[in-house]
UniProtKB/Swiss-Prot annotation:
InterPro entries: Mur-like_cat_sf, Mur_ligase_C, Mur_ligase_C_dom_sf, Mur_ligase_cen, MurD. This is UDP-N-acetylmuramoylalanine--D-glutamate ligase. It is found in: Cytoplasm. It comes from Clostridium kluyveri (strain ATCC 8527 / DSM 555 / NBRC 12016 / NCIMB 10680 / K1). Gene3D superfamilies: Mur ligase, C-terminal domain, Mur-like, catalytic domain, NAD(P)-binding Rossmann-like Domain. ATP binds at residues 124-130. One of its GO terms (molecular function) is UDP-N-acetylmuramoylalanine-D-glutamate ligase activity. The gene is murD. Pfam families: Mur_ligase_C, Mur_ligase_M, MurD-like_N. Its main location: cytoplasm.
């Protein structure tokens, strides 16, 4: 049930608020809370030097700063605490604060609660950003004033008073954001579910339960969009509280989105031909079908077709960088899981030179070896997981007698140079790490941009 934002303004006024994490979304949140008359303290593990100019700005606004390794030692005596998404609600500091009466929430939870416009929420292990961006563009093409946020775009809560009931909002939601949510968007999309983020979640069951929160609190008039081809998402149909619309690239559906030979269809109507779309790979066909299903009630076929046949993708997602001496280089830095890397590999017509490896999210790489070996010509490994991935391919060789040449590298520069040395005219080199970036880079964007710099400097 949507609430009037005036209620929040009354609720927040003169309250003592703690904001944990001074990041991309929380800086605008702090400014917004101050504007509404709250007393704000900001907490972050970083030192004043690491935060830099932002720390000085916040102090000038009379925000109390608690910084450094012991920043969570005292969260007591706060009325409300806004936490950063990746922090677990069951951490001792939050448990203690809750016991003392604090209301613990997040920027995105409060946005969904008070946003007056229809919200389309998108989650999944892979394909979230592309699907979210497609939906945003289709809605804009239809003529709606549209907003995009959550894991991508700009923080939205500070803009909530600018949004009207006639607008449309598309948000990308991670499992971290969903873990503590007790409110769901009117339209919920789950692109797929496979093992991911098991470095943060206790186990796969907790990860799946977090994803389910996107529809757990829907009403009977709301919509849930699910991937029929994914075993885990298909099994969720019986748990839906509202309407369900599915999509499939494997079978024709009476209702929903599907691939019929070379046509992308929704509810029996052709949207466009497979040959007309610019996005590479069948995983992107799934993303398009998911977007069609989510928007079927609000847009026409023409708007879907226009975006489907002109949208060329989001940066760092199977992004063509350059061709050098007949070798094509692609940046797929977003691929932070084995399943996402597999989807990228399947977009190419022949085996590629794959650069992989990075931060260990505690997920297995057996699936990458067993389902990806036929798409890999040479494997160049780097980062914290390079030996773990190497072991998966060595096990494959023992089991199936399939040998994939493996090169070990100590940096991205070394990995790219190694890939170049073994490449020949007609080859494809792709950075598709199957891992997060945090062992070597602050985020996947920096990793992808460095890859592009290295390639463009060759």
């Amino acid at each position: 049930m949507k609430r009037n934002f005036d209620d929040f303004k009354q609720f927040i006024k003169c309250k003592k608020i703690g904001v944990v994490g001074i990041g991309i979304s929380n800086k605008p949140l702090i400014d917004f809370l101050l504007k509404l008359g709250a007393r704000v303290s900001a907490f972050d593990k970083k030192s004043p030097d690491e935060i830099g100019e932002v720390a000085r700005e916040l102090k000038e606004k009379n925000v109390d700063l608690v910084l450094g390794e012991k920043y969570l030692n005292d969260l007591s005596d706060f009325d409300i605490i806004f936490k950063t998404p990746s922090m677990r609600i069951d951490s001792p500091a939050f448990v203690k604060a809750k016991e003392k009466g604090a209301y613990i929430t997040s920027e995105m939870e409060e946005f969904i609660r008070y946003c007056p416009a229809k919200i389309y929420g998108v989650t999944g292990s892979d394909g979230k950003t592309t699907t979210t961006t497609l939906m945003y563009n289709i809605l804009k093409k239809q003529g709606y004033k549209s907003w995009i946020g959550g894991n991508i775009g700009t923080p939205l809560f500070s803009e909530v008073e600018e949004i009207t009931p006639d607008d449309r909002v598309v948000i990308e939601l991670s499992s971290f954001q969903l873990m503590t949510m007790n409110i769901s968007p009117e339209v919920a999309v789950i692109t797929n579910v496979s093992p991911n983020h098991l470095d943060i979640h206790k186990d796969m069951e907790e990860y799946i339960m977090a994803k389910k929160n996107i529809f757990k609190y829907q009403s009977n008039s709301d919509l849930l969009v699910l991937n029929k081809d994914n075993e885990l998402t298909n099994s969720m149909t019986g748990e839906a509280l509202g309407k369900v619309r599915q999509f499939s690239i494997k079978e024709k559906l009476n209702k929903g989105g599907y691939l019929n030979k070379d046509s992308l269809c929704i509810d029996g109507d052709e949207v466009c031909k497979l040959s007309e779309i610019k996005l590479k790979g069948m995983h992107n066909v799934e993303n398009l079908l998911a977007a069609f299903c989510a928007l079927k009630d609000d847009v026409n076929i023409e708007s879907m077709r226009e975006i489907a046949t002109t949208f060329s993708g989001v940066e760092h997602r199977c992004e063509f960088v350059r061709e050098i001496n007949g070798v094509k280089y692609y940046n797929d830095s977003i691929a932070s899981s084995p399943t996402r890397t597999l989807a990228g590999l399947k977009a190419f017509e022949k085996p590629v030179i794959l650069i992989a490896g990075g931060y260990d999210k505690k997920i297995p790489f057996d699936i990458l070896a067993e389902e990806g070996y036929s798409k890999i010509k040479t494997l160049v490994l780097m980062g914290a997981t390079k030996y773990k991935i190497k072991e998966a391919f060595e096990n494959l060789e023992l089991k199936k007698h399939v040998h994939i040449p493996i090169i070990m590298a100590n940096s991205l520069v070394e990995a790219v140079n190694s890939a170049r040395k073994v490449s020949c005219r007609g080859d494809v080199v792709t950075l598709s790490p199957a891992c997060a970036s945090f062992d070597m880079f602050a985020n996947f964007e920096i990793r992808g941009n460095m890859f592009k710099e290295i390639v463009n400097d060759m």
